[in-house]
Structure formats: structure tokens, C-alpha cells
Amino acid sequence: MRIFLLGLAACLSTLTWAAPVEQNPEAIKAQLQDYYFDAARRGDVPMLETFIESGYSLDTRDSKGYTALILAAYHGQAPAVERLLAAGADACAQDQRGNTALMGAIFKGELQIARRLMATDCSPDQRNGAGQTAAMYAGLFKRLELLDALKAKGADLNAEDPLGNSAVRLASGEIRTAAPR
């Protein structure tokens, strides 16, 4: 009986091995996106290069609207940011909250990356969903060198968000918040 069961198991495993594996296209797409976004977070330029060479859509978004460029900038991966920009990634892309790669880099204090992103053709006064600009982030986080560079690029440092905050006010430490309810 043991020999029969072993033989049956061997035959079944052979049949299973030889059977074609059905692949769910949506599952494959999700797995590729996970690899792509993980490569951006880790700064894995060779992996990003594989995606670029295969024609993968550089501005693919995750569930929060993040692109690989936004993730690479936020996580301080300068070589990945450079490679994605060189391949044509959209530097002006916004996540679901309207934040850009530049805003993420300023928030995280990634000054080299922020400078590189400021060299793109994006408007220096691009606003997020809360009405904030990159200059407001630079003012809030006291990134005065970036604030000066944004001003030189044409940013309006007196532009206000809906609460009345401007880059100039934020840089001076004046922060307006919503009234308590």
C-alpha cells in the first residue's frame, strides 16, 4: 500500500509540475507595481533601469497616488530621482493630496533632490489639495536656501493658502491654523 501511495504521489506531483500555471493578469500587474515602487523607495537604479528599458509606464501610481519619482524623492534616493527624470518621469505629478516630489523632498530635508526637482519645468507655485506650495513647505521647515531658490525661479512667496499662511509668514514662524470648533 505504501508503494502505491508513493507512486500515486509521484504521478500527481509530475502532473502538477507539468500543468500550465494560470496567471491572473491583475495579480501580475499588482506585483510588478510593487517591485517598481519598492525599487524607487530603495534607490535600486538597476531594477528601475529594467522597468525603463521594458517601456513600463514611469508615472504609474499606487493607491495613494504616489509615483516612483515621488517615492524616490521622499526616501532620499538621488540617483533614482535622476534616472527617473532622465527617462521622462513627470516631475509635476501630484499624489492624491496634491503633493509633488518637490514638496516631499523639502518636507524630508532632501535638499540636493529638491534642488534637482526645482530645475524641472514645473510651476514653482503649484499647489497641493490644501492650497500649499513648495515655497510654503520651505518656509515652514526653515529651508531658507530653497526658499531663495524658489523665489529666483519665480515663486510667489506672498501667495496664501486658505488659512492665510504664506511662505514669508511661515518662514518667520507665524503659522495660522483653523479655529477650534
What are these regions (language model features)?
Residues 18-36, 120, 152-181:
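Ankyrin-repeat-protein effector appendages
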Residues 38-43, 71-77, 104-110, 137-143, ...:
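Ankyrin repeat A-helix N-terminal signature
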Residues 71-74, 78-82, 86, 92-120:
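Alpha-helical adaptor scaffolds
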Residues 17-54, 63-66:
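Intrinsically disordered, low-complexity regulatory segments in ankyrin-centric signaling systems
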Residues 44-52, 77-85, 110-118, 143-151, ...:
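Ankyrin repeat structural motif
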